[in-house]
């Protein structure tokens, strides 16, 4: 991964490392619930009840984590530094 990850990669990587449950809504409205096993630029591997699904990102509408994921962004860091300085 590059030095500067995008928000999508940060969210998915945090969910994967912390083994968080996600609900992924597809464009047709179908919800998929599970944990992220792996992901790349085009797909997400989701594990649900000891089964794995390969989900294409272009078919995803919304991703909702079971709990709030704190994302680190350069913009947030710059805003914090400006407030302190």
Swiss-Prot record:
GO molecular function, one term: RNA binding
GO biological process terms, semicolon-separated: regulation of DNA-templated transcription; regulation of RNA stability; regulation of translation, ncRNA-mediated
Family: Belongs to the Hfq family.
Organism annotation: Leptospira interrogans serogroup Icterohaemorrhagiae serovar Lai (strain 56601)
NCBIfam families hit by this protein: Hfq, PRK00395.1
Subunit structure: Homohexamer.
Top-level taxon of origin: Bacteria
InterPro entries in the record: Hfq, LSM_dom_sf, Sm
One GO cellular component, as annotated: cytosol
Keyword Amino-acid biosynthesis: no
Keywords (A to Z) from UniProt: RNA-binding, Stress response
Protein name as annotated: RNA-binding protein Hfq
Pfam families: Hfq
Record's function text: RNA chaperone that binds small regulatory RNA (sRNAs) and mRNAs to facilitate mRNA translational regulation in response to envelope stress, environmental stress and changes in metabolite concentrations. Also binds with high specificity to tRNAs.
Domain Sm: 9-69
């Amino acid at each position: 991964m590059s030095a500067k990850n995008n928000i999508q990669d940060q969210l998915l990587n945090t969910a994967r490392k912390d083994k968080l449950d996600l609900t992924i809504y597809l464009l047709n409205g179908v919800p998929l619930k599970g944990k992220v096993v792996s992901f790349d630029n085009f797909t997400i591997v989701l594990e649900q009840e000891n089964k794995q699904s390969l989900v294409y990102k272009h078919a995803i509408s919304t991703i909702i984590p079971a709990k709030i994921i704190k994302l680190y962004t350069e913009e947030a860091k710059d805003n914090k530094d400006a407030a302190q300085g």
